[in-house]
From Swiss-Prot:
Gene that encodes it: atpG
Membrane disposition: Peripheral membrane protein
Compartment annotation: Cell membrane
Source organism: Roseiflexus castenholzii (strain DSM 13941 / HLO8)
CDD domains according to UniProt: F1-ATPase_gamma
GO molecular function: ATP binding; proton-transporting ATP synthase activity, rotational mechanism
Protein name: ATP synthase gamma chain
Length: 290
């Protein structure tokens, strides 16, 4: 049985750990709220951009070939953008995303497709290197509040790759923020773009300058960039949410362990007192018999 001194030392250690995890929980909660606001702030722009593209593609018939709208009959090259955190301590979030990435890559390889991976985040980058996947680009250290310009390199890479024929399809894998307790690994196709088509009776007769085709060609890359940026923001909100929950669970477990150790300490202390009293009583009885 451990001594009372050893148990007291363990109680202090667990108490200090609980204070650390509680502080990390509070920090993650604050960052999660700001990350959620960032996600919501981008949605009006993305929704309006989607509406305009639906209007334009409905009018610019036959403009798919040679653009980011072109659906190719035979798929040979596939790009997968994997969005993960730079840091751990986020529960099973990273493992779930990487497990989904491995399954996607395996499925595409079984179809005889060449898969190239572009990693956003250290965890995904390290996993792809460790498993010897075809990693062609990486972006790390985006921080908690990345800007659109931070992901333009990756976006430009896949856009140029698609237009050159290197990629026939481009996907992004990220952790979708559902709510504080649920973050879902999600794969979304970025390219070719499949915008909604407005019914003819709902179309408004806008005038576009210099032309509908030119405006559409300019908007298509912006749409890909915004979609990728939204995926990154969703992943960051999911990361902070998962870390907050993980740290809360760690704090609760530490407090429970502290209670168990305190109970063990009291039992050990009581046993020592009982032993000392018994020894004193035995000594007194021995003296009385002399």
């Amino acid at each position: 049985m451990p001594s009372t001194r050893e148990i007291r030392r363990r109680i202090r250690s667990v108490k200090n750990l609980a204070q650390i995890t509680r502080a990390m929980e509070m920090v993650s909660a604050s960052k999660m709220r700001r990350a959620q606001r960032n996600v919501l702030a981008t949605r009006p722009y993305a929704d309006r951009l989607l509406d305009v593209m639906g209007e334009l593609t409905g009018r610019a018939v036959g403009m798919r070939r040679g653009t980011l709208l072109e659906v190719r009959p035979v798929v040979k090259g596939v790009a997968l953008i994997v969005v993960t955190p730079d840091r751990g301590l986020a529960g099973s979030l990273v493992a779930n995303v990487l497990r989904r990435a491995s399954r996607f890559i395996l499925d595409e390889q079984e179809k005889k497709h060449t898969v190239e991976v572009l990693a956003i985040g250290k965890k995904g980058r390290d996993f792809m290197v460790r498993t010897r996947q075809n990693l062609v680009a990486e972006v790390t250290k985006l921080g908690d509040y990345p800007r659109l310009t931070d992901i333009l390199g990756i976006a430009t890479n896949v856009i140029n790759g698609f237009l050159s024929g290197r990629y026939d399809e481009v996907y992004v894998l990220y952790s979708q923020f559902v709510n504080t307790l649920v973050q879902r690994p999600t794969i979304k196709r970025l390219l070719p773009i499949d915008p909604p088509h407005e019914p003819a009776e709902r179309m408004v007769d806008y005038t576009y300058e210099p032309s509908q085709e030119e405006v559409l060609r300019a908007l298509l890359p912006r749409f890909v960039e915004v979609q990728l940026y939204q995926a990154v923001l969703e992943a960051i909100a999911s990361e902070h949410s998962a870390r907050m929950v993980a740290m809360r669970n760690a704090t609760d477990n530490a407090k429970e362990l502290q209670r168990d150790l305190t109970l063990s300490y009291n039992k050990t202390r009581q046993a020592n007192i009982t032993k000392e009293v018994s020894e004193i009583a035995s000594g007194a009885a021995a003296l009385a018999e002399m």
